[in-house]
Amino acid sequence: MTREIAIGNVKMGGSRPLVLIAGPCVIENETATLRCAERLMTIVNGLSIPLIFKASYDKANRTSVTAFRGPGLKEGLRILAKVKESLGLPVISDIHSIEQVQPAAEVLDILQIPAFLCRQTDLLVEAARTGCVVNVKKGQFLAPWDMENVVGKIVASGNERIILTERGASFGYNNLVSDMRSLPIMRRFGFPVVFDATHSVQLPGGQGGSSGGQREFVEYLSRAAVATGIDGVFLEVHEEPDKALCDGPNSVPLDDLPVLLKKLKAIDAIVK
């Protein structure tokens, strides 16, 4: 069993019910971000599912230099602070450099380490020293057991408020595959484990200048992952994914979310 950690008004891990981490891939603008957060709240309140709101202020590893990256650190954190204060939701976003850590920690409940940066010791240590919860996405290039070394870096820096997230493993060119064995393997380290069901169906760089995705498989993979007894599921959502400025092909339409969450909640209740 994993340890229980508090994230704002949400508790994750141990024998706690499944937690949802959800939101748009990137902050497109303030209005759309707040509207998405409000819709998510309405959905989860009807299902009694704990929610942590996710949106990136900067997508620093987009495929193309011309791709939309977001509003940036200062404006993005202002918008996330507004979501947090107006709706009472814990918030999470990516950090990409040690310079971003302190300002991000003043707003965010969870500092997220992107998969491509999961071995960057200086970034892990700086994030750990804030005392914030640190969510590390397992690199597409890492074996699940290699994440124990990542955990060790954070713990050695005085922080045991850790979440580990599986988001697929590279499988040839422009493709990812989900190995469900990684979930119980990482849970053995004693910290909550989350499955990122939307990035796991991403086709990195699959559209030439941007990534593709296969959102039709999100439900199947998330159901399988929840059946292993994980602590949370991570879903990027959008009102109109085909018009999204980032990761639309693998995002879940908000209109489809209630049905999916009902299924995941039922599976979680059985396995826990």
Curated annotation (Swiss-Prot):
GO terms for cellular component: cytoplasm. Its EC number is 2.5.1.55. Gene3D superfamilies: Aldolase class I. Pathway: Carbohydrate biosynthesis; 3-deoxy-D-manno-octulosonate biosynthesis; 3-deoxy-D-manno-octulosonate from D-ribulose 5-phosphate: step 2/3; Bacterial outer membrane biogenesis; lipopolysaccharide biosynthesis. It is found in: Cytoplasm. GO terms for biological process: keto-3-deoxy-D-manno-octulosonic acid biosynthetic process. The keyword Transferase applies. Keywords: Cytoplasm, Lipopolysaccharide biosynthesis, Transferase. Its main location: cytoplasm. It catalyses: D-arabinose 5-phosphate + phosphoenolpyruvate + H2O = 3-deoxy-alpha-D-manno-2-octulosonate-8-phosphate + phosphate. The keyword Ribonucleoprotein does not apply. InterPro entries: Aldolase_TIM, DAHP1/KDSA, KDO8P_synthase. It is an enzyme of class 2 (transferase). GO terms for molecular function: 3-deoxy-8-phosphooctulonate synthase activity. It holds the Pfam family DAHP_synth_1. Belongs to the KdsA family. This is 2-dehydro-3-deoxyphosphooctonate aldolase. It comes from Geobacter metallireducens (strain ATCC 53774 / DSM 7210 / GS-15).
